[in-house]
Amino acid sequence: MAHTFRGCSLAFMFIITWLLIKAKIDACKRGDVTVKPSHVILLGSTVNITCSLKPRQGCFHYSRRNKLILYKFDRRINFHHGHSLNSQVTGLPLGTTLFVCKLACINSDEIQICGAEIFVGVAPEQPQNLSCIQKGEQGTVACTWERGRDTHLYTEYTLQLSGPKNLTWQKQCKDIYCDYLDFGINLTPESPESNFTAKVTAVNSLGSSSSLPSTFTFLDIVRPLPPWDIRIKFQKASVSRCTLYWRDEGLVLLNRLRYRPSNSRLWNMVNVTKAKGRHDLLDLKPFTEYEFQISSKLHLYKGSWSDWSESLRAQTPEEEPTGMLDVWYMKRHIDYSRQQISLFWKNLSVSEARGKILHYQVTLQELTGGKAMTQNITGHTSWTTVIPRTGNWAVAVSAANSKGSSLPTRINIMNLCEAGLLAPRQVSANSEGMDNILVTWQPPRKDPSAVQEYVVEWRELHPGGDTQVPLNWLRSRPYNVSALISENIKSYICYEIRVYALSGDQGGCSSILGNSKHKAPLSGPHINAITEEKGSILISWNSIPVQEQMGCLLHYRIYWKERDSNSQPQLCEIPYRVSQNSHPINSLQPRVTYVLWMTALTAAGESSHGNEREFCLQGKANWMAFVAPSICIAIIMVGIFSTHYFQQKVFVLLAALRPQWCSREIPDPANSTCAKKYPIAEEKTQLPLDRLLIDWPTPEDPEPLVISEVLHQVTPVFRHPPCSNWPQREKGIQGHQASEKDMMHSASSPPPPRALQAESRQLVDLYKVLESRGSDPKPENPACPWTVLPAGDLPTHDGYLPSNIDDLPSHEAPLADSLEELEPQHISLSVFPSSSLHPLTFSCGDKLTLDQLKMRCDSLML
């Protein structure tokens, strides 16, 4: 089975070889291409190329119809009609160039005849910088060199090493790019001073070249292996006692060390001789991570350094902190007796902390008493406490690690903005790039030389004034008037910036708002309430979230317009203040529904409007608008009512509007039994009116006339229209009218004189037949024309007082007619009921005397 398989394999290989030979032969079966002087030429040489057809391989056996074409790669460079073609070619480039000869017949495709490759190159240059090295005591010798320029031809390199006792080692390399060869032999330190010679030779078709011989000894070419097993040890956990350990080969005489902090690019170098694998380092920093590397060498002057060892990373021990904390503070009044102190400080640098800071110690002291009031331990970089507003206070802050504490930083608590003359002037904040703000100011008005330092403070602006917002600050020398702040600066965030000028125990400050980048706010304020206050409205709103403000706000705008109105809205622009969240508006009209909304503005533009709220002012209109016209109307009415003519017309109108129950007539005495029984007596007593008015004596204490009460239901008097006094033509009537005149003035103002005269005459006629005396006439009144009736003759039954003037004598009718003309015609316009009044209750018993009864033309009065 094995013999069969082996035979098949040999047969397969034979077939493949025959096919390749056949293909080679068939490639040029129609002709040949020859190149002279050679297929390999030197750069810049000329070659002759000949293409010839074999017998009977042309076109139809006619040579004139044979067209031979010569191609250089795919480009035609020459052609000829016949059996052969000769062409001379120059200027060939470095490398390989392919030429192909083809036959072209009429009405047929071109037929390939044969081809040839021409190799253009240069002779090898002399190899340079030949060097040999043996890595470690147990390594092998290897050499490197520089080839020079590329020959573009097949080149063979031969490396030869000769040693003592005619020892020779040789190694070849047939790679065109060969520049390294390893002999694979090891030189031993038995003869460290023995010389060895190395040489390399390059050979190709155009020539050869050899390097200069390189002579060296064992110590020259042996490179030690890098040190290994590196470690470090700190004695008593002290950075001042640090020892580095490593391991080396036995023949190493010299070492070099390099080390650096892990965050640094610069190395510290140390050379040590006969270190024997250890070295003490004295300049390391506490609590710092270092990177260590070591290299070795066999001889001080001969040989080469080993490669650097692998890095060792280690952290040094802690030490007591150095430096002092940078402390700043804020003060805020709580009430009349207390204040809040917030302390802030920056972390120490790594070189100052010299370890991990475990905590900070804060000591608050009242300077007057001199004793420590508060001591606190905190792990944060801020601390807040409440102290009295009285007294002088100082604070000290120090940092502590596992080895100790730093020196305390002491500051006196004072009012940083108390001295107005120390306040920096013309403070400005401008954007300086993406995350930087340039703050500039002018020295205070007070002597600038008094300023010891400036402090620039900044923090994110929060509407609520949150004291938990991180505080940032930097200190500047007194001759500086600008500062570039970049720590914790973000785009589209507004910062409250303060510049303090400090001088001893005094300070002055100025503030401004600034941002590194801004654009229009993303939203407007949200109106949460609208209230009415004394004819105006108070609008309250929620502040825009900080992340939507997109920079420092400059103004708020309040817009309003009438609901369902297409007119342009009115607006009110309010300068932005951090603590403001309400604003009054007093230009709205009452009982009109308005739509209100708000926007906010930055230096980049205006935000979209916030929510809309409707509101209608329901309060009273402006009272001055009603008081002023009312006063004017009252003055005009008083002026009108003060005229006599208008008063008379008004009284007539009031009499017409008087209720019906107020104008009920008094019972007429003419209808009484007494008047009907003695009509003759009444007629006999007729006297002229003029005589009655002239000769009427003044009564002196008349006896009361007893009259039975016949008014079972008397209407109460609610209104007393004015009646006039009696006319004063005679002295006898003046005394009788005195009491009645007083009563009339107490009821109302006197009516016009004409009405008084008419009324007086009417009353005289009504009572002309009655005598208010006793039964017998007195002798002192002999001239009295009245008829005297005895008391016994008076009727004992009920009677009525006369009120009908129609029964009077005829000679007095004209007087009655004239009185009727003066009285206004009765018009019943009253809206008051006349039948629902309660009876008038008299307190005079069963009898009503005339001294208790006073009768007027329009009312009955007791």
Curated annotation (Swiss-Prot):
A motif (WSXWS motif) lies at residues 305-309. It is a single-pass type I membrane protein. Residues 1-23 form the signal peptide. This is Interleukin-12 receptor subunit beta-2. Coiled coil: none annotated. Belongs to the type I cytokine receptor family. Type 2 subfamily. GO terms for cellular component: external side of plasma membrane; plasma membrane; receptor complex. The keyword Phosphoprotein applies. Receptor for interleukin-12. This subunit is the signaling component coupling to the JAK2/STAT4 pathway. Promotes the proliferation of T-cells as well as NK cells. Induces the promotion of T-cells towards the Th1 phenotype by strongly enhancing IFN-gamma production. The modification Phosphotyrosine is found at residue 800. Induction: In vitro, up-regulated by IFN-alpha. It holds the Pfam family Lep_receptor_Ig. Residues 644-862 are cytoplasmic. Residues 725-755 are annotated as: Disordered. Glycans are attached at residues 48, 129, 166, 195, 271, 347, 376, 480. Changing residue 804 to A: No effect on in vitro STAT4 binding to a phosphorylated Y-800 peptide. Isoform 2 is expressed at similar levels in both naive and activated T-cells.
